[in-house]
Regions:
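Glyoxalase I/VOC metalloenzyme domain signal
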Residues: 7-164
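Short, solvent-exposed loop/turn elements at beta->coil junctions and helix N-caps
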Residues: 2-5
Length: 164
């Protein structure tokens, strides 16, 4: 179990997976509805799927195919990429591809890499995620969660606005 930081509080996250890592389920809980997960849980009366992630063998090719079909990725803050560059010192080409595609990145101590691409929120809080793992990266990109959550909150309609 690990904590994910949201500007509205802490989200408790528990990951469950099969031995091969081909099926992974992450369950989130929050003590208040000020967090993105807490609001979603409250609005869905405690039981719903907030997002579905698909694995890709090449996240950049997946992004290109999605864009050709009208997809617009969740817009990640430029500050994220400044922090990313300082943390990992990526080569210019990789850095530019991540930033221009709004792709999140993580690397573990063994050199395993993790790439994440998100859709905007649809309807009442549902979104898609595309992930690519390279090497033996076994995590879920928890370091990226606050940036994803902030981007989702920025893109959400203001509180009090009609939903439809």
């Amino acid at each position: 179990m690990f904590d994910v930081i949201d500007s509205g509080g802490v989200i408790r996250s528990q990951a469950i997976e099969n031995a091969e890592g081909t099926m992974r389920i992450t369950m989130n809980g929050a003590e208040n509805r000020k967090t993105l997960a807490g609001h979603f849980i409250a609005e869905s009366f405690g039981s719903a799927i907030q997002h579905v992630a698909f694995e890709s063998g090449d996240i950049f090719a997946s992004l290109d195919a999605l864009i050709r079909n009208g997809f617009k990725p969740l817009q990640i803050s430029p500050n994220y990429y400044e922090d990313l560059d300082a943390r990992f010192g990526l080569d210019d080409e990789m850095f530019d591809r991540l930033k221009s595609g709004n792709i999140l990145y993580d690397r573990d101590d063994n050199g395993g890499e993790y790439f994440q691409l998100y859709s905007p929120i649809y309807g009442e809080g549902f979104f898609f995620e595309i992930v690519e793992r390279r090497g033996d990266y076994a995590g879920y990109g928890a370091r990226n969660a606050p940036f994803r959550i902030a981007a989702q909150k920025r893109s959400a309609p203001p509180a009090g606005m009609p939903r439809r």
